[in-house]
Every structure is written in structure tokens, then in C-alpha cells.
Amino acid sequence: MDKDLWAKMHGATVHFPIALVLFSFTLDGAGYAFSKLAMRRGLHSAGYWSMLLGAAGTVPAVVSGLVMTKGVLLGHDTLRVHHLFAWPTFALIVGIAIWRALGRGSTNERPSLGYVVAVGIAAVLVSATGYWGGEMVVGR
Amino acid sequence: MAVSAIASAAALGSAYGLSVDLRHRASQPSHQQATPEDWFERSTPRSPALVAQGRKAFLNSCAHCHGVDASGDEGPDLHELEGSDRYISRTILHGVKGEMPSFAKKLGSDDIVKLTAYLRSLK
């Protein structure tokens, strides 16, 4: 087996939650901000599915990261910073996705302002997590 | 909202449980099987002085991967190693491909003897 398999898996899988959460925030944010827009419902529907898929994508990202580091939860230096962002981000994304999935109304209903703010926070946290992950790969 | 919080806690709990399991597995001895060369070979001397010197060498060269008490960290637990003294010496000298670097340039034959004596003392 390739000794770098799990590092490669982690590198591949992390991009799904990063992209999908950012995408979800952009879509739901645009739909919330432009409430008179004709395609508002389409934006919220896409935001809904992006968030759910992004949350599903966190699982392989987290599992591959844990296997790669042999179970290290925090670590040292840059890895520690990466993990300090990663764990709250993971918890928040899963919680938000469940919140949206169990919410009343159809998938293209306008979500609450609190929800949009929470997704915005998740988008910032996932970006920071990705930044510090990248620092370990290409940083000096 | 409560369900979301429970889901978040469950996700973190699962990650923690996986972490504990992975760290436990990482601390197990290596899967490599040693040959029973000790049937044919003289054992490395194991005086207390040699073991103490080996401990020093271990802390300098090995503890950052195998833990200060040799019970494993990034590298496996070194207590009650299987295989002969020669197997241990060769592993230190040549490393394990993809897992452990070679120490041929860093350690001399005396250091290897001391390290082997120390590792053999670990029960």
C-alpha cells in the first residue's frame, strides 16, 4: 500500500466540504439578500443540498486526517492551529446541516437570518482550517 | 436546535473515539516478523552500565518517535521486542522502509550495542 495514501486521501477529500460550505453560504446569502429575486427559491434549494453534501464530505476528510496522523487530535505548531480550527468547524457544519435538514418547510424555503449567519461563520472557519492545512503542505 | 447540538457532539465524539483507537493501534509493535536468530547467536552484553548508556542514546535518538518511556508515540512500543539482538541492531542500522529512517550515519557500533542492551531491558 502507498505509504502516503492517507495523506493523498485527506488532500483530496478536504476540498469537498470547503467548496460546498462556501458555495452554500454564497447561495443562501444571495437568496436571503435579494429576496425579490425570481430565482431565489432555486438559490435556497442549491444552498440546502450544498450544505448537506458539504457536511457529508466532512466525514471522509476527518477520517483520512485522523488516520494520516495516527489519531493525533491536536499536535504541535501548525498542525495544532489547523486542528484548533478543524474540530469546531466539523462540529458546526454537522450541526448546521442537521438543523437545515430537520427544519420545517421545503428545501427551497428562505432560511432564517441566524442560519445564514451560522453558515457564514462555518465558511470562515472552514477557510481558516484549509489555510492552516495548506501551510503545512507549502508553508515554510 | 437541540438535535443539531446532539449531532455535533456525536460527530466530535466519534472523531475522538476514532482517534483513541488509532493511537492505540499505532502504539502496538510493528507487524514485521523477526527470524529466531537468537538460537545461533551470542546475546549482546547487558550490564547495568551498558543499559544506562543505552537509555541515554535512546533519549537522544529514538524517544521523539518511540516516546520517552519507549511505549510508543509515532513509532511502536519497544517493550518485549521479538527477534534476536542482531535483528534489533539491523533495524536500527537500516531502518524500516516507509516507517523508520536508517541510523547508520548517526550511530556507531558501540551506540547500537548500548541501545540493544537498553531495549532488551524493557519489560
Predicted feature locations:
Chain A
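Polytopic transmembrane helical bundles with strong interfacial aromatic enrichment
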Residues: M1-R140
